[in-house]
Regions:
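Short amphipathic alpha-helix that is part of the acyltransferase structural core
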Residues: 1-31, 39, 43, 115, ...
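Conserved beta-strand in the GNAT
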Residues: 41, 47-55, 60-67
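Conserved acetyl-CoA-binding loop-helix of GNAT-fold acetyltransferases
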Residues: 68, 74-87
Length: 142
């Protein structure tokens, strides 16, 4: 697959994108996502190669989740999705899985206290079967 990281097309997701988003989430081990928030998709050569969902809780905007197709990783898709969401909404809060923390740190995200994360979003971590192994880190992208 060819993916030009300098030109991923990002747009708001439509109902027609639901199956591709569900497949990416399932492949990432996230199971079935609950319908909430607003999702945006990244396209390369007309194919969805990633998505980000933004959820509003307690006046803040949260990334919940961001997923990039494994074949499109390290090509700028995740960076483009995060930058686009920040441009649309301002500061973004989220809980990073441990292995993804270096990506977020390189993007300029900072660690925050767990209490900064809305309980509505934090419960996703509390009920996750991978919670103990995940080494989750609450973060903000300003």
């Amino acid at each position: 697959m060819t993916c030009d990281p300098s030109t991923p097309t990002i747009r708001e997701a439509t109902q027609q994108d639901a199956a591709a988003i569900a497949r990416l989430a399932e492949d990432a081990g996230m199971g079935t996502l609950t319908p909430r928030g607003t999702s945006y998709v990244a396209l390369s050569e007309g194919r969805i190669v990633g998505f980000i969902r933004i959820v509003k809780a307690e006046g803040d905007r949260y990334v919940s989740p961001i997923v990039v197709d494994p074949q499109a990783r390290r090509l700028g898709v995740g960076r483009a999705l995060m930058q686009d969401a920040r441009a649309r909404y301002g500061a973004l809060l989220f809980v990073a899985r441990g292995p993804a923390v270096p990506f977020y740190t390189a993007l300029g995200c900072e660690q925050v206290e767990r209490e900064r994360i809305s309980p509505d979003l934090g419960e996703d971590c509390d009920t996750c079967p991978d919670f103990a192994a995940c080494r989750h880190v609450p973060m903000i992208y300003r």
